[in-house]
């Protein structure tokens, strides 16, 4: 599969056909674009007491995003091609941009389809949106057009994804985007798209695109290879593992949600429910309904799991590849209604969706030249993959598929609420939701309102030629909604992970994790170093109301320097920095703590704050050094500088390390108390170094055993 993917991406980046340039082809010319930050006008705090957002506001948000894209369009023939951002993205040469332009077209159409269904006469920057997309659809099969796409002649390609995505949007608003096309144009478009849809694919979420191409044209009366269609649908279902999660060959990430759990229910609602196999296919009469039931059963599983990944206020976590797709993560939430399940809290789901949307639309760094940036908030190269172009960001547009639900639907008519955060997740406690089928762990922290994910990662840098499955998108010990991840530096600047100075003299982080078990609320993993399998970490996470208690054992064949990083804090507000000495971005303070039971001496703890949060990292056992913070530049997705509390020392043989990583919200007002910095009463380690008994101040005991 690796060779296929390599061929695919090289083809995407290099094999496009040089095009005749127009003004918009240059990608840098723009008209006056939308306001920098989206404004919720006339918010409805009766129906939506947290976000103020109603279905109408979602329509306005879609128009706001699409307006920015149309700021680059001067005529019906101009492509959806946007200014390149970050060198690692494609295309490398502006002349080789055909696939990037198709990607911009298909993905902005995710937004346009639902908007046009609501308002077929939508006009942006003096251009009728429906006319533009119909013109572009017909240009695909016009050999005289610079947008012409030839029928497939090779293997899997990005072209398959984008052409099939057009089918999703055409189905969303067929009366505007498909039905007005002349029959001859429909036939030509069917022939081109089916040449890709019935061709080879990759055994991941890509198979959905083949399914949508075949399903759309089957629905329009065209003959398609239904045996292939059913085979791909079955293979997609085979990727399901449990608790709402699909394995995307090989990762668990947001693709489970913005692909499998969005495309599956959409396919059921618009195709599977009413499909009948053709007589010549020889397929069972109810095969499509049987497949539909399986997709919906899997969708039902996510309802009691996935929403817990979001913060109390509805913000999403920075985790996994393609994170620049951002609020596409909420796409499956409204589509839950297609399953007609009982006891669904639609008000909570909509609160999450609207809050995540505003998390980005109201961030000042989200747009540049009217187009979403290549990053999480602003541009941030470490979280971007080489398969992305600037138009890729409009994958976010799938979130607007929820507009296909009517105003009086359960989803849009429910009153926003906080779900279990309101009365079930109580302050002073921590709540873990293990996902047994995958080993993922979701943790909720009512004290701060944050949520945390412990992730899948088992990929070597050597085999990860695209350099994202082995990287920070997956390899952190944990991901928290309150602390977007910092990229690793070359000098040991490593957050929320262990780093080991390997035999090459390079800092190497853990990435080859194996999940072992989750017993007595202890999350147990093991990991080895990629460059030296004799370097072994036994990892145990004990989650506390205000942070993480790590009970780990590192084993090394030779004396080796290691480091363990906490989460990081970006620079605080201008108002906060105004309270500091000139040139400072953070403040810190020392707190003296008494000795724990069984200790002779107490300890001094340094707490760091940016005005919004305070962090503390406290060595309890095995460390011979005190925590010391560093202030990396250019590694954080939110600000240029951040603060990273960390511990670093040399270890030899086997060493047990017990560490507290704590945080407190609203630290500018109060900060940690000495009591809050002492959740652990005692740490007892057996003489054979195989058992650690932790006694918490609450009286609870946690016992960790090592080999």
Residue ranges and their predicted role:
Residues 28-103, 131-136:
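Low-complexity, Ser/Thr/Pro/Gly-enriched N-terminal "stalk/linker" regions
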Residues 1-30:
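Bacterial Sec-dependent N-terminal signal peptides
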Residues 358, 386-406, 410-576, 583:
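Catalytic and substrate-binding regions of extracellular carbohydrate-active enzymes
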Residues 83-93, 377-380, 420-425, 533:
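Short linear interaction motifs
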Residues 98-104, 109-119, 126-337:
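Aromatic-lined, polymer-binding surfaces characteristic
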Residues 10, 91-96, 148-153, 427, ...:
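Short alpha-helical segments and helix-capping/turn motifs at coil-helix boundaries
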Residues 478, 491-707:
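Extended repeat-based interaction scaffolds and adjacent low-complexity, acidic/S/T/P-biased segments
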Residues 144-149, 189, 283, 311-318, ...:
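Carbohydrate-active enzyme catalytic cores, enriched for enzymes
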């Amino acid at each position: 599969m690796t060779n296929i993917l390599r061929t695919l991406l090289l083809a995407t980046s290099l094999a496009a056909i040089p095009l005749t340039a127009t003004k918009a082809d240059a990608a840098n010319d723009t008209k006056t674009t939308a306001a920098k930050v989206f404004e919720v006008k006339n918010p409805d705090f009766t129906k939506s007491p947290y976000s103020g957002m109603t279905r109408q506001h979602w329509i306005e948000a879609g128009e706001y995003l699409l307006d920015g894209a149309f700021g680059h369009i001067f005529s019906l023939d101009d492509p959806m091609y946007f200014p390149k951002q970050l060198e690692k993205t494609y295309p490398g040469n502006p002349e080789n941009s055909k696939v990037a332009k198709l990607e911009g077209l298909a993905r902005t159409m995710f937004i346009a389809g639902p908007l046009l269904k609501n308002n077929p006469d939508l006009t942006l920057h003096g251009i009728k949106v429906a006319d533009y997309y119909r013109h572009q659809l017909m240009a695909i099969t016009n050999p005289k057009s610079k947008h012409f796409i030839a029928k497939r002649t090779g293997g899997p390609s990005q072209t398959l994804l984008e052409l099939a995505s057009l089918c999703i949007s055409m189905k969303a608003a067929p009366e505007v985007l498909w039905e007005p096309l002349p029959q001859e144009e429909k036939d030509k478009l069917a022939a081109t798209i089916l040449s890709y849809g019935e061709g080879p694919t990759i055994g991941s979420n890509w198979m959905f695109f083949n399914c949508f191409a075949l399903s759309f044209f089957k629905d329009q009366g065209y003959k398609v290879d239904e045996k292939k269609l059913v085979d791909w649908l079955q293979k997609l279902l085979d990727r399901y593992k449990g608790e709402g999660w699909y394995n995307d060959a090989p990762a668990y990430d947001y693709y489970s949600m913005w692909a499998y759990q969005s495309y599956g229910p959409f396919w059921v609602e618009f195709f599977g429910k009413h499909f009948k196999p053709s007589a010549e296919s020889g397929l069972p009469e109810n095969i499509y309904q049987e497949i539909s039931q399986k997709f919906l059963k899997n969708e039902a599983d996510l309802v009691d799991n996935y929403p817990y990944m979001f913060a109390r206020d509805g913000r999403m976590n920075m985790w996994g590849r393609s994170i620049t797709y951002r609020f596409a993560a909420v796409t499956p939430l409204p589509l839950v209604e297609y399953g007609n399940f009982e006891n669904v809290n639609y008000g909570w789901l909509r609160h999450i969706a609207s809050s995540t949307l505003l998390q980005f639309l109201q961030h000042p760094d989200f747009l540049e030249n009217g187009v979403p940036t290549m990053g999480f908030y602003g541009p941030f190269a470490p979280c971007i993959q080489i398969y992305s172009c600037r138009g890729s960001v409009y994958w976010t547009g799938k979130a607007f598929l929820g507009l296909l639900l009517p105003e009086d639907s359960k989803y849009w008519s429910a009153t926003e609420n906080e779900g279990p955060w309101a009365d079930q997740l109580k302050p002073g406690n921590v709540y873990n939701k293990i996902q047994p089928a995958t080993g993922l762990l979701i943790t909720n922290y009512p004290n701060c309102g944050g949520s945390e994910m412990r992730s899948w990662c088992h990929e070597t840098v050597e085999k990860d030629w695209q350099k994202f499955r082995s990287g920070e998108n997956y390899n952190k010990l944990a991901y928290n909604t309150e602390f977007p991840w910092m990229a690793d530096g070359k000098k040991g600047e490593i957050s929320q992970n262990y780093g080991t100075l390997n035999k090459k003299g390079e800092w190497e982080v853990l990435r080859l994790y194996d999940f072992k078990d989750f017993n007595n609320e202890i999350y147990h993993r093991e990991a080895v170093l990629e460059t030296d399998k004799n370097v072994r970490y036994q990892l145990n996470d004990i989650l506390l109301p205000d942070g993480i208690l790590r009970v780990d054992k590192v084993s090394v064949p030779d004396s080796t320097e290691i480091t363990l990083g906490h989460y990081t804090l970006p620079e605080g507000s201008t108002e906060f920095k105004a309270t500091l000495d000139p040139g400072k971005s953070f403040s810190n303070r020392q707190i003296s703590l008494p000795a724990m039971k069984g200790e002779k001496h107490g300890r001094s703890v340094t707490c760091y704050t940016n005005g919004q949060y305070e962090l503390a990292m406290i060595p309890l056992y095995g460390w011979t050094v005190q925590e010391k913070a560093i202030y990396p530049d250019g590694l954080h997705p939110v600000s240029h500088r951040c603060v990273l509390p960390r511990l670093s020392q040399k270890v030899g043989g086997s060493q047990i390390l017990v560490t507290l990583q704590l945080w407190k919200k609203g630290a500018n007002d109060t900060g940690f108390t000495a009591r809050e910095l002492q959740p652990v009463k005692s740490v007892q380690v057996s003489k054979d170094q195989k058992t650690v008994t932790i006694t918490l101040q609450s009286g609870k005991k946690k016992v960790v055993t090592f080999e």
